[in-house]
Regions:
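Beta-rich carbohydrate-recognition modules and glycan-binding surfaces
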Residues: 31-214
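Bacterial N-terminal signal peptides
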Residues: 15-27
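Active-site-adjacent substrate/metal-binding segments within catalytic domains
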Residues: 230-422, 440-477, 564-565, 569-572, ...
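N-terminal accessory beta-strand-rich subdomains and adjacent acidic, glycine-rich linkers
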Residues: 144-155, 166-176, 182-192, 203-280, ...
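Short, solvent-exposed loop/turn and secondary-structure capping segments
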Residues: 111-113, 151-153, 196-198, 214, ...
Length: 755
């Protein structure tokens, strides 16, 4: 490590002349205190480097006329530039943000980690994605902060121009005592070649005016971002109506083409050998390939869309009205689309998020009204104009949505779709089983949508019985229903591959009290195997003086180790029994209440081998949410082949940041134009796996740019924008890919001989 203390005499030698620097340095905002200037350094700060350096004595002028100092971060694990007070600590207690005037000196973006460390060793960290281009002022919040504090998953695009400067707001995590700041460091994680960064100054901002301005008037009257332009962006109602009229003509032509395809009433392929018609959807494996079979006895490849619903455009406005440029006033007709909600549910998905309850506005419904709503009748003599009440015309919307899906080559309504769409008798559909109740639950360390239900608790069986009975009540004899999903993305494990995550269910159970049935079941398993604490202590390599110590809350179980293989075997056995109990409970209830329909698996986001094995035993289909470029990247398909069960991709998605919503979703692509090829490639890869029987896109509609009600997600995920305008390039690519998939399956079936 090299420490550099700049003296006034060195300052003259190492920088450009002071007058020149004053002319070309960027302005300092009101409320900003300069901690250290790399252009005009003072002796009050220690500057140290590790695997980094400042090779030039002089600062340098950029193409824009700014004067900055070059820092070279050499190839190493974490080259670092560190600033610290010459004596004592800094008191930043009056500060709101750490500010840095930075510029990438490369032709590409740089990832820069900022760490603020307190005298007690605690840290506040921030990762800067510094784009190539001119210098910008980076603002790091001095308390943990993210766009969730503004009610949304991802914030507006950065940098943006404010006060004559390019401003880049970052997130921060952790905490420090701002009265006791010991250092601030900049590092670049693991560069393969030397990376050059230009820096002018480091400072403290005492107010949050720039931060508030970044979120002010961010959303326009149509629910779109005000910070960008794109081809489908709507500027006025006339444009909305014109787009709707053009689309209707296109849909008619595409639906006419679909009518020429050789399909049965449910979308099954009229090709190849016959299958038995049993009146409901079922599965069958033939010649090494799994199929869904329609009620009429034809092979069916499920091309679906999740969340085909008209309520996806709602976003909270209460407390953040300034974010919206043109919300309807109380006397405005569109005020009919306000409502009230509360999504403060205590789950991990809502932690750290503000603005999660109160008044919301439904931009999608308002846009439907603008495009398709009935006009007021002219006023008669002495009478006011007759205006129909503003409500979404559900019949028109449902027919339009079904027309779209069929014209675009889809044949299945995925999870969380409007129930009335399935009851229209035009398209097969799926339903969720949402099991809620007062049963015990276990934390695995993830808990995004909540803790794991305890299937050993009799109250879970009662809740399951109730949920299945309600779900099946109006669908028991409906041949259009394919089946039911067993909840969604349960926390079978914690994120990561380390043992504590892999066996999070076992660890979490043993930390609980014996009031929890799952813990009693686990302890019984161990007691039956080892008989007493001596046997368990020897097998696990621990000192357990009395068995009752395991019954205490907070018991910390040992990590698996090669020296004590029984630890891992015991965890695996418990998790296997746990998963079997869970899926058997649901399967038994479904066989009683809905014997004609399929159990479509658990829609895994994270899973364990035990959970997947149990699902294969008790469910008709395994289902996975794959946010990967192809299904094979999401799971070991050699392992799935051993289980010999059909697989449904229950969610997949590709998004970008160039169409309004600020979050691209779990799988980001560079441009909107990349989404279509990615969709086609995913389907091609899915068809290569003979156990995959379908793939469901997530989702129908873009999420609100200001964050959906449930958890603040604000992703560009949709086939359709919040304005109800489809993305034409993506739709065209999706339609062609769906048609190609069906043609490929038809060709394969026609080659197969009759059994």
């Amino acid at each position: 490590m090299m420490a550099l203390k700049e003296s006034p005499s060195l300052m003259v030698r190492r920088t450009l002349p002071a007058v020149f620097a004053l002319l070309f340095s960027s302005s300092v905002w009101a409320g900003q205190q300069t901690l250290f200037s790399f252009v005009r350094p003072a002796s009050v700060v220690n500057v140290a480097t590790e695997d980094a350096g400042m090779p030039q004595y002089n600062a340098e002028q950029t193409a824009e006329g700014e004067v900055l100092r070059r820092v070279v971060f050499n190839p190493a694990q974490r080259p670092t530039l560190r600033l610290s007070p010459q004596s004592g600590v800094w008191d930043w207690s009056s500060g709101k943000f750490l500010t840095l005037r930075l510029q990438s000196a490369m032709d590409w973006a740089l990832t820069v980690d900022v760490t603020v460390q307190g005298s007690d060793g605690r840290t506040l960290t921030s990762r800067i994605d510094l784009p190539a281009g001119p210098a910008q002022t980076v603002m790091v919040p001095l308390t943990a902060s993210s766009p969730l504090s503004q009610g949304m998953r991802a914030g507006p695009p950065m940098p943006w121009l404010h006060g004559g400067q390019r401003l880049l707001l970052t997130n921060s995590a952790g905490a420090v005592d701002l009265k006791q700041v010991a250092s601030v460091s900049l590092s670049i994680p693991g560069p393969k070649v030397a990376q050059n960064l230009l820096i002018e100054r480091v400072g403290i901002q005492d107010d949050d005016q720039a931060y508030q301005a970044a979120y002010r008037e961010l959303i326009d009257a149509y629910g779109q971002s005000t910070r960008g332009s794109w081809p489908e962006k709507v500027a006025n109602d006339e444009q909305l109506k014109a787009a709707a009229n053009r689309e209707q003509q296109q849909l008619k032509a595409w639906l006419a083409e679909r009518g020429k395809q050789q399909l049965d009433a449910y979308g099954g392929l009229l090709a190849g050998p016959a299958f038995a018609a049993e009146g409901f959807f079922r599965t069958e494996k033939r010649d090494g390939r799994w199929y869904l079979i329609t009620p009429d006895g034809h092979p069916f490849y499920s091309l679906g869309v999740n969340a085909v619903a008209a309520d996806g455009g709602r976003t909270y406005t209460a407390g953040r009205e300034a974010m919206f440029k043109a919300l309807p006033g109380e006397g405005d007709a569109l005020a009919a689309f306000y409502g009230e909600g509360n999504n403060d549910d205590g789950n991990a998905s809502s932690q750290g998020r503000n603005f999660k309850k109160g008044r919301w506005f439904d931009f999608y419904a308002a846009n439907l009204q603008r495009a398709y709503g009935k006009l007021c009748l002219p006023a008669a003599a002495g009478q006011p104009a007759a205006c129909p009440p503003l409500v979404v015309d559900t019949g028109r919307w449902q027919a339009h949505a079904l027309d779209r899906l069929q014209a675009w080559g889809f044949n299945t309504l995925g999870n969380w779709s409007e129930p009335a769409l399935g009851q229209a008798g035009r398209m097969p559909y799926t339903l969720p089983l949402s099991i809620v109740g007062d049963y015990a639950s276990i934390s695995t360390g993830m808990d995004w949508w909540g803790r794991m239900p305890d299937p050993f608790d009799p109250r879970f069986a009662m809740a399951t019985e109730r949920a299945v009975a309600i779900a099946a009540r109006d669908h028991r004899d409906d041949p259009w229903l394919i089946g039911y999903f067993a909840d969604n993305e349960l926390a079978w494990a914690a994120p990561g591959s380390e043992p504590r995550a892999r066996y999070g269910l076992a660890y979490g159970t043993l930390r609980l009290t014996t009031d929890v049935p799952a813990k009693r079941a686990f302890l019984k398993q161990l007691r039956d195997k080892y008989r007493n604490q001596e046997g368990l202590s020897k097998a696990w390599g621990i000192e357990l003086n009395v068995w009752e110590l395991m019954e205490d809350p907070g018991f910390e179980a040992p990590l698996p180790s090669p020296e004590h293989p029984e630890i891992e075997r015991d965890y695996q056995h418990f998790q296997q029994v746990f998963a079997e109990t869970y899926f058997k409970t649901i399967s038994d209830a479904l066989k009683w209440h809905a014997p004609n329909h399929l159990l479509l698996g658990g829609r895994y986001a994270v899973s364990t081998p035990e959970a997947v094995n149990a699902c294969a035993e008790f469910c008709d289909v395994l289902s996975f949410n794959f946010y990967t470029l192809k299904p094979q990247d999401g799971y070991d398909f050699a392992r799935l082949a051993e289980l010999d069960k059909p697989v449904l991709v229950s969610e997949f998605q590709f998004g970008s940041r160039d169409r309004g919503p600020f979050w691209p979703g779990p799988l980001e692509l560079a441009r909107e134009e990349d989404r279509g090829p990615a969709y086609a490639n995913f389907l091609t890869a899915a068809l290569q796996q003979p156990m995959i029987v379908g793939a469901h896109w997530f989702q129908y509609l873009d999420q609100p740019a200001s964050g959906r009600l449930l958890d603040g997600e604000n992703g560009h995920l949709g086939l359709v924008a919040i304005t109800d305008v489809p993305y034409p390039g993506f739709i065209d690519a999706v339609r062609k890919a769906n048609a190609q998939a069906m043609a490929q399956l038809r060709t394969g079936l026609e080659k197969k001989p009759a059994p």
